[in-house]
A protein has these predicted regions:
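An acidic/polar, Gly/Ser/Thr-rich interaction patch typically located in mid-to-C-terminal regions
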Residues: 17-46, 183-317
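Broad hydrophobic/π-residue packing in well-ordered secondary structure
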Residues: 37, 65, 101, 125, ...
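Generic preference for hydrophobic/aromatic residues in regular secondary structure cores
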Residues: 4-8, 52-58, 97, 102, ...
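Charged- and aromatic-enriched interaction segments used to assemble
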Residues: 79-188
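Assembly/oligomerization scaffold segments
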Residues: 1-97, 149-152, 157, 179-181, ...
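Short, acidic/charged, Gly/Pro-enriched secondary-structure junctions
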Residues: 2-11, 40-72, 103-117, 259-282, ...
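Residue-identity detector for glutamine
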Residues: 70, 131-133, 216, 235
Length: 317
């Protein structure tokens, strides 16, 4: 029996009870605004246009979203139905924010002006005393996410309670070794960056440098060049630090396959007694896939080691 249970609703918010759940795949990714759900099920009859889907792990809502695709095959035994759904963040991703330039904005003000009903902002107030420009084509999700990232270096996500929160966690998940079906580790040196050479004025040379002593110790020599002259002063430090950390984020990557449904969320810290598991620092979940099909039920976790890059800055004399 699957660990997740599902509730389906039509356009009139009437619950449609499936005859059976054949398979599901629930995916979360730190690089994606929306969680995704693929669901195959049997219905007594076809015809109802499904609108929303919720998934529960016990009494806890694990997914709250909207149907993007509904595909049915009808025969004498009823209807076989495939659903692809995105989490409620899709309402913000699919809607455009008003192009505007805000003076000394805060995330609270941007939320009140640009998001509207249906969501709650659940984070400490983030603010800046500089202008923030929202360009044409920016989504409502991007309105909040881009501002928070430029100020703090952190991204946001929308959880199943429709709460807008920071994509970070201090929760530690301990995984029993007996539950682990397989483990993979990758060291990705090809994309790693030792440092950045940058300039603050377009007429200057690349006199400023940010290097990672950690990557120097690993004998990584690759560097990148950035022109920071068009980057507002208040965004420069975040932009530099984020560039180096993002380039090296997947240096040590883990994939753990666990039996059953694992109650874990993005950015949770993973602990296990595998040899060498935390040699590069805390291991943080960046992707989660829960699957149930004819082969059984399992969870695959993609995780990165949170490196201490030991960053050092200097200027040419």
């Amino acid at each position: 029996m699957a660990d997740l249970t599902f509730k389906l609703y039509d356009l009139d918010d009437n619950e449609i009870k499936p005859k059976a759940v054949l398979s599901y795949e629930l995916s979360r990714d730190a690089d994606a605004a929306c969680d995704g759900l693929r669901l195959n099920l049997l219905l007594d009859e076809a015809g109802a246009e499904l609108y929303t889907v919720k998934a529960f792990y016990g009494k806890v809502c694990a997914f709250n979203g909207y149907v993007d695709t509904q595909r049915e095959s009808i025969n004498a035994n009823g209807s076989t139905c495939f659903l692809y759904c995105r989490s409620s963040a899709c309402l913000l991703v699919d809607s455009e924010a008003k192009p505007f330039t805000y003076n000394s904005p805060s995330v609270n003000a941007l939320f009140e002006i640009g998001i509207g009903d249906g969501f709650r902002l659940c984070m400490d107030n983030v603010f800046s005393d500089i202008q923030y420009q929202v360009s044409k084509g920016t989504s409502k999700f991007g309105l909040i996410n881009d501002f928070v990232f430029n100020v703090t270096g952190n991204r946001i996500r929308v959880n199943p309670k429709n709460e807008i929160v920071m994509l970070k966690s201090e929760r530690v998940i301990k995984i029993d070794r007996d539950r682990i079906l397989s483990v993979k580790r990758e060291i990705n040196r090809g994309n790693a960056v030792m440092g950045v050479d940058y300039k603050l004025n377009s007429s200057d040379d690349y006199l400023y440098h940010r290097v990672s002593r950690f990557m120097q110790k690993k004998r990584i020599s690759a560097t990148r060049m950035l022109n920071m002259s068009n980057v507002p002063d208040w965004q420069r430090e975040t932009r530099l630090s984020s560039f180096v950390s993002n380039a090296n984020a997947g240096y040590c990557c883990w994939e753990l396959k666990l039996s059953g449904y694992a109650d874990i969320d993005l950015a949770d810290i993973i602990r296990t007694d595998l040899d060498g598991f935390d040699d590069y620092g805390d291991v943080v979940a960046v992707g989660i896939r829960h699957t149930c099909n004819a082969s059984g039920e399992y969870t695959v976790i993609k995780a990165y080691s949170a490196l201490d890059l030991e960053e050092l800055s200097y200027v040419d004399e």
